[in-house]
């Protein structure tokens, strides 16, 4: 299912919050008074919302729950009478799918037979991921978000009847809401790298639909263009570890794409970039030795509660292309973001962490560890993504997560990776060349066959002539 939201805001907090959506056809007016605003790199806070509009978003604040390693979800209702489900918010896919059969990891599931508004489309659905899969049946039903816009829409729903390594024990969500573009709403999946078994503390955040809530961020919003409308693809132009440039060709950062994906836990980097980044992080944190398995995300490191030496780990800065020509901005994350806390049962008195930067074979993925602590605006109407520091941003005694700019960066368009395209004329040329090569190989064979046939005919004629002579004798 491809959502059609002009504006979506995801704000994932870094602390525990009190407990207090987005389908095909939802189109909401932007409550920000931006009709004539110029497209600048920064959007001053006083110009992007009409006075008195703050109350419009009160019901949407703190509507996200979840865990960093298991995804963040929003409460939704499906069917008539409404059935309440927790749905994972995923900006890296475009399908809307819910559990529709009993499963050991589900406390509840969508029961189609109890909905008077369910319509069966009589189509099967099969979606494989790098790890795991699910399959089910496609239909439509009425959907709404209680802590969201006051809108009920009919949406396409994939009812999951069978799955393998898709639902996560203890995650508390029963379905997935893909908020990316229609181009990737194919019935297959590229990857679903959430963690299946680790227990972590619950945190919360907000998903605001239709505008911007200024109470949830500090400073200015900085926007980067959406390069292509499939995933939320952006362009990274520079990477620094503790202020030291990795000095790589910027195309390496975006090979074969760079996306913002709330459905992925880690910051995932292409192989060359990952190796360079880990080397720099190791050098910066050399006062302590860590096992190789830690850097590969396979082992935990633990310290006595309250004694984690955050200061030995470097900050990581990603520079993103800005909206103004030759200008970029940077987002800086702290080790409190890329060292993900994990509750280790065996050593519950310790603070244990997992390295949340991993290697990728499908480009850079800015996952939940990047988005946590930032206010992220998915502005589909203007084809851009905004970043600001959240109101509960990550910080320690000396450092804080930041969004800063502008920085002069020429030729940023060259940093984007372009998949080689082979046009039809090239394919036809290749086909003709192959046909000519085949003809050259076949010609000698044909000549040999013809020669053999001729010799056989001549021999047959000679034998007949010999028989005639013997009869005359």
From Swiss-Prot:
It is found in: Cell membrane; Golgi apparatus, trans-Golgi network; Endoplasmic reticulum; Endosome. The lineage of its organism: Eukaryota, Metazoa, Chordata, Craniata, Vertebrata. Residues 22-45 form a propeptide. CDD domains: beta_secretase_like. There is a cross-link at residue 473 (Glycyl lysine isopeptide (Lys-Gly) (interchain with G-Cter in ubiquitin)). Residues 451-473 are annotated as: Interaction with RTN3. Keywords: Acetylation, Aspartyl protease, Cell membrane, Cell projection, Cytoplasmic vesicle, Disulfide bond, Endoplasmic reticulum, Endosome, Glycoprotein, Golgi apparatus, Hydrolase, Isopeptide bond, Lipoprotein, Lysosome, Membrane, Palmitate, Phosphoprotein, Protease, Signal, Transmembrane, Transmembrane helix, Ubl conjugation, Zymogen. The keyword Repressor does not apply. The keyword Lipoprotein applies. This is Beta-secretase 1. GO terms for biological process: amyloid-beta metabolic process; membrane protein ectodomain proteolysis; proteolysis. Residues 1-21 form the signal peptide. Coiled coil: none annotated. Residues 72-388 form the Peptidase A1 domain. Disulfide bonds join 188-392, 250-415, 302-352. Monomer. Interacts (via DXXLL motif) with GGA1, GGA2 and GGA3 (via their VHS domain); the interaction highly increases when BACE1 is phosphorylated at Ser-470. Interacts with RTN1; RTN2; RTN3 and RTN4; the interaction leads to inhibition of amyloid precursor protein processing. Interacts with SNX6. Interacts with PCSK9. Interacts with NAT8 and NAT8B. Interacts with BIN1. Interacts (via extracellular domain) with ADAM10 (via extracellular domain). Interacts with SORL1; this interaction may affect binding with APP and hence reduce APP cleavage. Interacts with NRDC AND NRG1. A lipid is attached at residues 446, 450, 454, 457 (S-palmitoyl cysteine). It is a single-pass type I membrane protein. Residues 22-429 are extracellular. It holds the Pfam family Asp.
């Amino acid at each position: 299912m491809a959502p059609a939201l002009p504006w979506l805001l995801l704000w994932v907090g870094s602390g525990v919050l009190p407990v207090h959506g987005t389908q095909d056809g939802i189109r909401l007016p932007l409550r920000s008074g931006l009709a004539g605003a110029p497209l600048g790199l920064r959007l001053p806070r006083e110009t992007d919302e009409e006075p008195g509009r703050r109350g419009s978003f009160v019901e949407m604040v703190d509507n996200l729950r979840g865990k960093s390693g298991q995804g963040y979800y929003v409460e939704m209702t499906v069917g008539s009478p409404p059935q309440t489900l927790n749905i994972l918010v995923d900006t890296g896919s475009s399908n809307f799918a819910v559990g529709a059969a009993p499963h050991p990891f589900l406390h509840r599931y969508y029961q189609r037979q109890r909905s008077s508004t369910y319509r069966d489309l009589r189509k099967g659905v099969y979606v494989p991921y790098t790890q795991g899969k699910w399959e089910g049946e496609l239909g439509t039903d009425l959907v709404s978000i209680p802590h969201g816009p006051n809108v009920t829409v009919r949406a396409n729903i994939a009812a999951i009847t069978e799955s393998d390594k898709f639902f996560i024990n203890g995650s508390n969500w029963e379905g997935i809401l893909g908020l990316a573009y229609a181009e990737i709403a194919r019935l297959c999946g590229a990857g679903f790298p959430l963690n299946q078994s680790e227990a972590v503390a619950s945190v919360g955040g907000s998903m605001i639909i239709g505008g911007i809530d200024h109470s949830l961020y500090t400073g200015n919003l900085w926007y980067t263009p959406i390069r292509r409308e499939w995933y939320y693809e952006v362009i990274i132009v520079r990477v620094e570890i503790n202020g030291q440039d990795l000095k790589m060709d910027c195309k390496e950062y975006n090979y074969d794409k760079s996306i913002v994906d709330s459905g992925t836990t880690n910051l995932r980097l292409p192989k060359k970039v990952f190796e360079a980044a880990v080397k720099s992080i190791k050098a910066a944190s050399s006062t302590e030795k860590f096992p190789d398995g830690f850097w590969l995300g396979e082992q935990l490191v633990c310290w006595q509660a309250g004694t984690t030496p955050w200061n030995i780990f470097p900050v990581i800065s990603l520079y993103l292309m800005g909206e103004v020509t030759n200008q970029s901005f940077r987002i800086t994350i702290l080790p409190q973001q890329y060292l993900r806390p994990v509750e280790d049962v065996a050593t519950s008195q310790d603070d244990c962490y997992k390295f949340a930067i991993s290697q990728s074979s499908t480009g850079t993925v800015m996952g939940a560890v990047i988005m946590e602590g930032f206010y992220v605006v998915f502005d589909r109407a203007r084809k851009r993504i905004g970043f600001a520091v959240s109101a509960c941003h990550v910080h320690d005694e000396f450092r804080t997560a930041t969004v800063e700019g502008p920085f002069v960066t020429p030729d940023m368009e060259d940093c984007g990776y372009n998949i080689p395209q082979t046009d039809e004329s090239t394919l036809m040329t290749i086909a003709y060349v192959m046909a000519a090569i085949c003809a050259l190989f076949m010609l000698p064979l044909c000549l040999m066959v013809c020669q053999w046939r001729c010799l056989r005919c001549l021999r047959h004629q000679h034998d007949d002539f010999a028989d005639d002579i013997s009869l005359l004798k």
